Amino acid sequence: SKLIWAAAGPARRRLGTELSGPAADLPALPAGFGPVRMAGPGMLALGGPRHTLERNCPDPCMEALTRALEAWPGREAFPLLVVADDADFCAAHLDNFLWVTFTRSDPATDVYGVKAAIQAKHWSCEAPLLVDARQKPFHAPPLEEDPAVVRRVEALAAPGGPLHNLL
């Protein structure tokens, strides 16, 4: 599946850069959601409950989350909210945020939004748009570094090694 996020024209909002003021007044979230972390201007990572549904099934807990966020006074400042298994990892670095968001989500089933609507076959929502980027049961297991392999590669990249200045 593919998602096109088209934007044109003058800025519509000022992106949030910290969870303070109205943005800090998050409503009570459904069970299993939290903590929330800043991932970048206008972007939040939110921890979510373990995903247990089959492929291509909309998640009722994500729908409940969108309803809860309707009353959030800071939502216009954060138009993108990514639900992840580990919000701290997701928000720690932009690389992590991009990896988690775009390798663990399917636009056909994992994109939600506050007051989502379809008009003339075009999907729309109010802020925030939510991406369900939790690890799904049907995903391949995450890649984990093997410390022995890491040491061998680092040795190859050391001064005098064949991969020096390449890694």
Describe the role of every protein-language-model region.
Residues S1-L167:
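Charged, compositionally biased interaction regions
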